[in-house]
Amino acid sequence: DHASMNNDLFQQARSAYVSKDYETALAQFTNCLQDTSAALAPGELGMLYHQIGNCLVKLHDPNEAIHAYSQAKIDTSYDAQGSVNYNLGMVYASQHDYDDAVTYFQMAIDDPKYQTPHKAYMGLGNSLLKIGKSAEAGAAFRSAALDETNPDPTKALLNLGVCFMALDRPMDAIASYESALQFDMAPAIRNKMFANMGQAYVAAGKMNKAVRAFESALADKTY
């Protein structure tokens, strides 16, 4: 009499998922869910629905994915609710439903157990930008950049600069870009950063600096 789900089946499903065989993974996770010989322990229902949702996202079935993630949220013993909320935010954003996306990204951020808030802050900022809330988006990108779990703050700082430009604050945009330049980044991103910086200097009426920034953007830094 098992006190939890069929672990062999679960491991098979996980390895199918890792091998990008999402159809098989979906079928096997669903089997774990429907296996009556094993009563699910607290948290396992949420974990299975979370994995099923991930499979459905990979299989480009957003509506069913939303349904699965919503089922996962019902299992309050499941620890990774922050991740489920983040995934819901991503699915809603992919469907251009930015208001719902904002709600779920915020829920992920508010969850103290959620380990990677910078990801939810990035999702939140991008969704807020889409609905024209540049100031709130900027605050979200700033939080993403400052999150010490963020391995690469450059994208957040680049987006923060974009928000400042939308708010007609070019000098603040320049400060964001300059703080980003201390980090390693791909040449294409670095060139974009210099081009954005050039535009910000133009907006601030500093033409000499604008020219220098544009020259840096055009000079191939790949050696």
Question: Predicted segment positions?
Answer:
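N-terminal leader/linker segments that initiate helical-solenoid repeat arrays
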Residues: 1-47
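TPR/TPR-like (Sel1-like) alpha-helical repeat modules
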Residues: 178-182, 195, 199-223
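Canonical tetratricopeptide repeat
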Residues: 44-47, 51, 87, 123, ...
